Amino acid sequence: MTVKVKFPKDIREYARKEKVKDSLIKLTETALAEAISKFHRRMIVLQGDTLNKAKLAGILAGGAARILSEYIPEMLERKLRDTEQIEVLYATDALGEDTYGRKRFEEFRKHFSLLAPTAELTSVTFKHSRDILGRTFDILVIDLSYDYSPNDLGRIIETVRGGGLIFVLTNPFEKWKDMWTGFHKSLVTPPYTIEDVKKRFNRRLIRKFTEHKGIYIVNTDRMSIERKPGKYRSQATLPEREKVEIPKNIRFPRELYELCLTRGQVEVLKTLEELIEKEGMVVLTADRGRGKSVSIGIASVGLAVSSKKKRFRIVVTAPEPENVQSLMKFAKKSLEVLGYKTKVITDNGLIKEVYAKGIGIRYYPPTKGYRQRAELYIVDEAAGIHVPILHRYLEKERVVFSSTIHGYEGAGRGFSVKFLKKAKEKREYKEVHLSTPIRYAEGDPIEKWLFDVLLLDAEPVELTEEDYELIRKMEVYLEEPDLDDWFENDREDLRHFVGIYVLAHYRNRPSDVALLADAPHHEARVLRLKNGKIVTAIQIAKEGGIPKAVIDKMAKGYKPPGNIIPDMMVKHHYAKEFARLKGYRVVRIATHPDAMDMGLGSKALELLIKEAEEKGLDWVGSGFGASPELIRFWVRNGFAVVHLSPTRNPVSGEYTAIVIKPISEKAKEIVKKANEEFRIRLTEWLGDTHRDLEPEIARWLFESPFGEAVNYPIYLTKTQKRRLEMFIKRILTYDTVVDAVKPLVKLYFLDGWMRPYLDERQIMLLIHRVLQAHDWKETAKLLNRTEMYTMVELRDIVRGLWYYYKHLIKDEEGEK
């Protein structure tokens, strides 16, 4: 079906009155005709210094909205949209009174509302852009004139459906490429100033506007087109969606299959039908915008209504409730299509719970969801959740894991690399991959532009057998890349560098790239093979060297931007002099996923420490989510643990650990003392603040690179000593001598390298039963032993420790 794409006569006359050239109207008509015909998006960049750009956006968007509104019935029939309302989104950095962002919005709205009064206009600030996740818009106006973050850019652009237009408001490119934005101001940290902040990311963004198809550029101050289409057009052919055939022998209601827009979604429903009568696990992967969450929302209702149970409870979890809004909305829609009355519970505008007769669907944070009883568990955006927590869901009878491969969620393939490999060892599962976009057709140029500018689809370099030989021989070198060259000339090395993070890390946000590009204290290091291939990527932040006046403020509670390690040392160890010292904080370190466990990470750290030493720095440190593997990695590389956060990260479920490798003599003195203090604190925290800390993590936190015992006197009364002897001789039980055993166990963990040898299981037993005071049943389960065996083993360990340490323990008179 061919349709006319021409501005109505009244809008053309209005535009001329407002001095809008016909060429700009033709440009908009052409962009819209291209978008409709291909079911893609098109972008028009309006660069300028005055309110003209907002006025022009209002007039052109108003005309486009009127054209789209004429063809809503045909688009609904072809399933190109699911609403009769034309929806327009205006996104900006600020909407407060007297802000420039507000003035531009008001100028836009004045013209737009006059020309397209029936369109629904939503305004949102970047800060609240998560509020529009799960919604879809026909037209987007995004104001980048002053402030934005790359995370916002990705999240907002992807809400526009095929056949839609995106208007981008910017400053004149020549001015913009040298401007500092609000995002830049947030990167300033002592001792740096705004003058030190780079502008690489904005320059990359400007360049990418001119490199990709489907993007047109207008200078609104001169009302001239600077990048125009090859051919103007005023007609479009309404496309047809791929015909989706409903399979025979379906078990979910047919009405649910009719909600599917792609064959991939049908496959998801068909796969989940297998969970009606038997337990099982399904893994769903897709790029952003492929209808993954929608499919799960529909299929979860299919399972609930097909179940023989009177009550069907569904637990939904994801890193953030925003991640599951599409799932919840389509679960609600599916229930209503089947004739159910629904009850929805929201929090801050986000759907948290959906109920119908006998069916309950509820969102829980990752650390709480697995504790609930349910018939089905759904883990959405699983790559953003800490692997040990994913393993808790792995134990459930019916569970669905889903993960975005590329997109602003930034999952990467780390989910497959780190979790699914281990999951295969525990249970069988079916995997479904969705490749066809839902909001727009394949090959959308705006998606290509977005993935390119934000490096969402970056991949590491491929490794050959010759490369592995170089790795085995450790023929590598550490290099500081020229970031100006990487970003200005769009080097492949940048994609390979970021690609390592995309594949190796659980979450990789677009703003991480901007931080690397522009933050004055952030730098990159790469471990290259002799042939130049990047195999390990390191992002570092230079910290310390803080002026005395700022340090005094820090000691009173002030938190400077950046400087995470100096700030922690000042507040938790009263080491004000440490903040004057300079060091590298390793922000991220990751090795090529095809070359893991070959010693590259340790080699990269070794060379980084050597570089820091040569540059006269005082320390190298890092902060990270504590897992047994990571703690072990850092400790084995000679780093001392100096801090553990009192609470777990609500998304990852991990405690944050901070480690430091001192280089200068002054740093060694301070860090040694901080490490000793931390170990003393940990012996107490394990029974209180960190009672739920995994013992396999705790045991590595006690390890020290200094090898010396902590000078921390342990006292036992004469009676306690006698009772301890009676426990060893099996006269008294453990529960009656806890007060005497605990100081002895503390002494062991505060000892140096000369402490008696205990194997891994024995160390875990001391931590779990004595320091964390868990009962015999839990401890025996942890160790995979009987309770009786565990009791006997603890007595044997205490006997050995007592004979080894009793000459060091003072009694109340101070005698040994």
From Swiss-Prot:
GO cellular component terms given for this protein: cytoplasm
Catalytic reaction(s) noted: cytidine(34) in elongator tRNA(Met) + acetyl-CoA + ATP + H2O = N(4)-acetylcytidine(34) in elongator tRNA(Met) + ADP + phosphate + CoA + H(+); a cytidine in RNA + acetyl-CoA + ATP + H2O = an N(4)-acetylcytidine in RNA + ADP + phosphate + CoA + H(+); a cytidine in tRNA + acetyl-CoA + ATP + H2O = an N(4)-acetylcytidine in tRNA + ADP + phosphate + CoA + H(+); a cytidine in mRNA + acetyl-CoA + ATP + H2O = an N(4)-acetylcytidine in mRNA + ADP + phosphate + CoA + H(+)
A Pfam family assignment: TmcA_N
Gene3D superfamilies: 3.40.50.11040, 3.40.630.30, P-loop containing nucleotide triphosphate hydrolases (3.40.50.300)
A GO MF label: tRNA binding
Keywords: Acyltransferase, ATP-binding, Cytoplasm, Helicase, Hydrolase, Nucleotide-binding, RNA-binding, rRNA processing, rRNA-binding, Transferase, tRNA processing, tRNA-binding
Positions annotated to bind acetyl-CoA: I589, A590, T591, E629, R636
EC number(s) per entry: 2.3.1.193
InterPro entries: Acyl_CoA_acyltransferase (IPR016181), GNAT_dom (IPR000182), NAT10/TcmA_helicase (IPR007807), P-loop_NTPase (IPR027417), TmcA/NAT10/Kre33 (IPR032672), TmcA_N (IPR013562), tRNA_acetyltr_TmcA (IPR024914)
Principal subcellular localisation of the protein: cytoplasm
Domain of life where this protein originates: Archaea
Domain N-acetyltransferase: 469-664
Subcellular locations according to the entry: Cytoplasm
UniProt-listed GO biological process terms: rRNA acetylation involved in maturation of SSU-rRNA; tRNA acetylation; tRNA wobble cytosine modification
Annotated positions binding ATP: Q265, R439
Role noted for this protein: Catalyzes the formation of N(4)-acetylcytidine (ac(4)C) at the wobble position of tRNA(Met), by using acetyl-CoA as an acetyl donor and ATP (or GTP).
Family in the record: Belongs to the TmcA family.
Name the record gives this protein: tRNA(Met) cytidine acetyltransferase TmcA
